[in-house]
């Protein structure tokens, strides 16, 4: 009984498997028949063509794969790892491309702006006259007359609307002309009216080109006159040295100021030249000579110094002077005389006495006559009523400028500006 049972079971399983296989084959045959029905008019019915057609005719939903559920980033990484370029991923930019992109963008924008500007410029110049006529036509007669009076133009008589419009239009075009090319668009009547208004003689039978030449000649002359006016205004501006106190000094003071800085200058030079040279060399230091420190001393300090160091029967045993400047000159000659005779130790002591003394003597050592003399030589006003304190306060800025040049803050500003301009020139030349 048992072998028979096993045989029946095997036959039953074989029958079930055969039925399933027949079902699958029937399904494939039906799909092939359906697809074949769609391609019954195909030019070729070879096996390969039918297989390709059947494969292409399958529904995409039934072909599904694991990649359908992947996110975009995972798909891009998968393609990149396998050396496949993804159409959705932009190419990687190199550093040069990264920095070049803004420049390319700016260049494109600049080109667009230039083309737009040229287009609008041509359009505006072409329609300028139409626009002016349209604007002026909207004005009343009183507004046209007020515009002419305000801009210093003569109002035509009897002052009809046509005359007012023509006069205002001519005046506006005359003010708006910046290049002579715009004259070519004017009519003969407009050119003749403008030339007649400017009192320019027009030859009989003049052509349109002749009128344009006359108008250009007039505007060239007017342009030169305006440039001359600008030049005259510029020339009328105060000279730069007027900001410094040197413009008050006498010619002798200016010459001494330059010579103590080794600037060659003639005593016959005009005052304008002396002022320009003094202003140009205001920051030039004085020559480092020991006797130059005597220029700021009073007569009392000068005499004390000479009597103290007058040795060996010097020719300056009896010093006679009529002014402080003569005494300074005598003291400098004394220094030059002893410099060639004294020993190095004596000269060192003499120089120490010069450098240890203040550059400007104290107020108490100056006499009233000396203060007045110095103020007059520097072109400064003498206080009235006279006061030694006020006179010395007015004298100090001149003495310090004469000995040291401009103030410290002015020096810093000057050298800062000079250094900045030098760096700019060096940068321009390096381009």
Curated annotation (Swiss-Prot):
Keywords: Cell cycle, Cell division, Membrane, Mitosis, Nucleus, Signal
GO CC annotations on file: mitotic nuclear bridge stalk; nuclear inner membrane
BP-aspect Gene Ontology terms: cell division; mitotic nuclear bridge organization; regulation of mitotic nuclear envelope disassembly
Main location: nucleus
Signal peptide coordinates: 1-21
Superkingdom as given in the UniProt entry: Eukaryota
Compartment(s) where it occurs, according to its Swiss-Prot or TrEMBL record: Nucleus inner membrane
Listed name of the protein: Nuclear bridge Ish domain protein les1
Organism annotation: Schizosaccharomyces pombe (strain 972 / ATCC 24843)
Native organism taxonomy: Eukaryota, Fungi, Dikarya, Ascomycota, Taphrinomycotina
Gene expressing this chain: les1
